[in-house]
Amino acid sequence: MTRSTYIWALAACLIACASANYGSSQGYGPESGSGASDGGADAASAAAAAAGGAGGAGGEYGGANAGAGALESGADAAGVAQAGQSSYGSDQNIPYKPVNTKGNTLTSSITYPQNKGEILIHRPAPIIVKRPPTKVLVNHPPLVVKPAPVVLHKPPAIVLRKVYVKHHPRRVKVEPVFVNVVKPPAEKYFVNENKQGYGQGSQSHGHGHGHGGHGHGHSGHGHGGHGAGPHGPGPHDGGRALPAYASGADSAAASAGYQLLQSGNQGLSALANIAGEREGPYGPAPSHQHYSAGPAGHGGYAAPAY
């Protein structure tokens, strides 16, 4: 088998694969499935023919190996053609299967709760609910439900009560449906500031103030201000300083500083370096730090920024 024969066999395989892919990409639904399958079969037959021609010659380039590779590529092309005939947006992974696609179906995603404050996975997004509804007004698909329903945390939950869903031009009685439920969020997004230690004067152990350059309020973290600026009252007058979650960068720096404070003097010097490297939303930190004379929480002390 010469080099030119091998190249021609490989080119025939590539052309067959390309034609199969082009034929399968033209179909957008089940009606184009037969054409895609025919294209895949044609591609497989063409690849097999090329493989036979290449394998029959045999020679220094291994005709048998070339034939096996051609058969493999033909099978891949047929698989791509088969995958192309499925319609977009399968409904096999949803807890209920709609009877029709017009939206006025009996299996609307409306459920009744057994308790309140839960979260229901409701296509296309979860809804946090406040109270059970007595009547639900549904506009058009995608369904808009107000007030939102809730279910128990027993997947899958069977709803025992019935709901009336108002569709134009008549009301439709909705039977109980199967729904998937999820657990509530693992963390609370609105934390209690008193428990977290935000803004409690100098007792806030690095959460909001940064003990590296203890400064006025946030000057150790580069929030600027020698007792002035939008950070408000500092730790000396016992007021509430700016919370550490004011911005993402500030929160990250505050948590990093809190970790560094656990390691003694080396941590304090490293914290001072962190404070000197970054600039806050109110400009760079001034070099004239006002050192704290008040007590520092947990036996710490106020060290100057280097």
UniProtKB/Swiss-Prot annotation:
Q: What is this protein called?
A: Chorion protein S38
Query: What are the protein's GO molecular function terms?
Result: structural constituent of egg chorion
Signal peptide range equals none
GO cellular component, alphabetical, reads:
egg chorion
Chain intervals for the UniProt region annotation (Disordered): 86-108, 196-244, 279-306
* InterPro entries registered for this protein in UniProt: Chorion_S36/S28 (IPR008449)
Which residue windows does the record flag with biased composition (Basic residues)? Answer: 206-224
The record's section on Pfam families has: Chorion_3
- GO BP: any one term: chorion-containing eggshell formation
Highest taxon in the source lineage? Eukaryota
